[in-house]
């Protein structure tokens, strides 16, 4: 049995709206080496306020890991959950950035930003992990420092955003961090391992987080939470 999300009006997902055609096949939780490590990183990001849920119920932030069949990504409507476990992830097996569609399996459909994650894996063969997080101070700090960014007219969850991110990943392979200018407060990091991406985000917070210069930990709320 499959369920299809065809339009943004029809498919609210707790992160805003799914803007791609989503073919979801209900299935057991994905079995993926490294998933526990990915979920542990996600929990650290949640505790740091880089992933979470706003008062209106809209979630923000998602993580993914390349697999032999595609990639696993945190599922839709999970932003407010601290620890997901395998059940909180969806396996994306097929996608088309140009066609604005993807196919996924799991107890829940893939995140609304899953197509952007797919674009990174497609553009950079060395990328194994992708993190999309939100932070106003980090967003502003990276921009002020001249970080790479997507166009302002490329909105979240759209083919335009996916293409823009893929272009950066293709030009700067292996690892990088960028600002999603058309997705307020949104940043995206990618790299060859979970550890590499975690280190990249920590480095960015340490060096570009506007409100806490010199802090060696993730501290988006003014207090240090994670080393």
Task: Please name every model-derived segment.
Residues 2-227:
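Glycine-rich flexible loops
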């Amino acid at each position: 049995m499959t369920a299809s999300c065809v339009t943004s009006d029809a498919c609210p997902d707790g992160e805003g709206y799914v803007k791609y055609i989503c073919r979801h096949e209900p299935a057991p939780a994905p079995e993926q080496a490294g998933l526990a490590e990915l979920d542990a990183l996600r929990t650290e990001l949640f505790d740091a306020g880089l992933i979470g849920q706003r008062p209106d119920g809209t979630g923000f932030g998602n993580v993914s890991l390349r697999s032999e069949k595609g990639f696993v990504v945190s599922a839709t409507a999970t932003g407010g959950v601290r620890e997901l476990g395998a059940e909180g992830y969806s396996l994306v097996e097929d996608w088309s950035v140009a066609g604005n569609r993807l196919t996924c399996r799991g107890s829940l459909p893939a995140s609304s930003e899953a197509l952007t994650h797919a674009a990174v894996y497609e553009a950079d063969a060395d990328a194994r992990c992708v993190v999309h997080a939100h932070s106003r101070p980090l967003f502003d700090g990276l921009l002020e420092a001249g970080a790479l960014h997507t166009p302002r007219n490329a909105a979240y969850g759209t083919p335009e955003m996916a293409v823009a991110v893929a272009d950066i990943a293709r030009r700067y392979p292996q690892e990088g961090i960028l600002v999603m200018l058309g997705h307020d407060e949104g940043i995206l990091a990618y790299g060859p391992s979970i550890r590499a991406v975690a280190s990249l985000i920590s480095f960015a917070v340490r060096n570009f987080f506007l409100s806490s210069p010199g802090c060696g930990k993730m501290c988006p709320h003014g207090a240090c939470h994670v080393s």
